[in-house]
Amino acid sequence: YFNLNTVFLYPHSFNDSLEYKQQNSTITGMVGNGALFGKMFLSKPALHLGFSNSRDKQNVGIHEFVHLIDMMDGDCDGFPEKLMEYAYAIPWLNLIYKKIQEIKNSDSNIRDYGATNKVEFFAVASEYFFERPKMLKNKHPILYEKLQLIYQQNTAEIRVDVNIRKKDLCPCGSGKRYKRCCLP
């Protein structure tokens, strides 16, 4: 990321002034701009929680890195221009506005914070794309398709947390049982 020089891990959530243990310390992640350009600030407990629970569609690390991707064209606007051809601009923005309205009407399982604006929608939808891709593909197929285009990957087809037993066929494709093939 050309627009990231430093990542700061804070021991707790923090406030706009980057102070923690204050009454208004509710921020768990932030990408700097202006004088703080090139810096990312993350709450270490929130970061750990995001990666320890991959089913809640919430991950501050993913969320803040998506803001960096969004900012690669110079604007944090919910539209990653460097990753999408111009022909996709209007359909993408129309989809964002439609999905934000669904969230506001409680007609969506996308996290409420995504209705804040198109910038946060892109980050929240991306968390969903990486944490619960099969659910996103099932419940929001057009959104999944657009995010797949943006990120150039089909996350719904990635096998995660596969529990292989010794008697199962080996996932390497040899046709042998796992215990007689690739079992470490």
Locate predicted features.
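Short cysteine/histidine-rich zinc-coordinating motifs and their immediately flanking basic loops
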Residues: 182-184
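Metalloprotease/metallohydrolase-associated module, dominated by Zn2+-dependent proteases
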Residues: 1, 14, 19-55, 75-167, ...
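Extended, charge-biased low-complexity segments
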Residues: 4-7
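Active-site recognition of the HExxH zinc-binding catalytic motif
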Residues: 56-73, 123
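Extracellular repeat turn/loop positions enriched in glycine and acidic/polar residues, especially those
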Residues: 173-175
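A general secondary-structure junction signal
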Residues: 9-13
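Short cysteine-rich clusters marking metal-coordination/redox-active sites
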Residues: 169-171
